[in-house]
């Protein structure tokens, strides 16, 4: 199973980070951050569907998507061409991301008014704190890899630190867990993380089950304006698009076509 392998492959890296920067010291550094996180929920509300544009170099299914990968340059293009938030993949082994990419984007100022979402396989409170330290305003939490108790723990900690959570589901049972945890931003992942197969009808099936007070984000497999129009008709608030953008020769032109 791909999801399980990704989590396992990253455990040694997490332990090394804990050794280099113990939790107590990490917590001190986070408390000293002078500026509050940008509210991603506010950025995703509106009449028109919003775009979360993803900084993504590679994936397990496609390999390297963009050889000439410059995360700061890509984030700047996103910020100038209508993105409402920027997702930054930080998983190293399968997506070739890094926490340093997140930090570089935040410190560069190219997207100073947009929330940054750390997209990774987060399962430990340590990762929540380090997300804030490296400049994240929000984090991804994947229900498929978390117990209900751990999901609630990570949600509570994130909110304590002022960060929003995109809580990702793929099935009805996962959606029920997310709603029971009082998640307010629900990500409907059209990709099965166990097989990496895409099915856009996932959003179609699950969207009607989500109460109106939640913000709904459709993720994965979104390639064209027609895809977005279809999802907009289903009542989603935002779409998360990565591969279709970073694989484009002209990212700005692709964004204009999508929006």
Curated annotation (Swiss-Prot):
Enzyme Commission designation: 4.1.1.48
Pfam families assigned to the protein according to its UniProt record, in alphabetical order: IGPS
Keyword Transmembrane attributed: no
Xref: Gene3D superfamilies: Aldolase class I
A GO biological process held by the record: L-tryptophan biosynthetic process
Pathway assigned to this chain's UniProt record: Amino-acid biosynthesis; L-tryptophan biosynthesis; L-tryptophan from chorismate: step 4/5
Keywords: Amino-acid biosynthesis, Aromatic amino acid biosynthesis, Decarboxylase, Lyase, Tryptophan biosynthesis
GO MF annotation terms: indole-3-glycerol-phosphate synthase activity; phosphoribosylanthranilate isomerase activity
Reactions performed catalytically: 1-(2-carboxyphenylamino)-1-deoxy-D-ribulose 5-phosphate + H(+) = (1S,2R)-1-C-(indol-3-yl)glycerol 3-phosphate + CO2 + H2O
HAMAP family on file: IGPS_B (MF_00134_B)
Family that this chain belongs to: Belongs to the TrpC family.
NCBIfam families membership: PRK00278.2-4
Name of the protein in question: Indole-3-glycerol phosphate synthase
Organism the protein comes from: Dehalococcoides mccartyi (strain ATCC BAA-2100 / JCM 16839 / KCTC 5957 / BAV1)
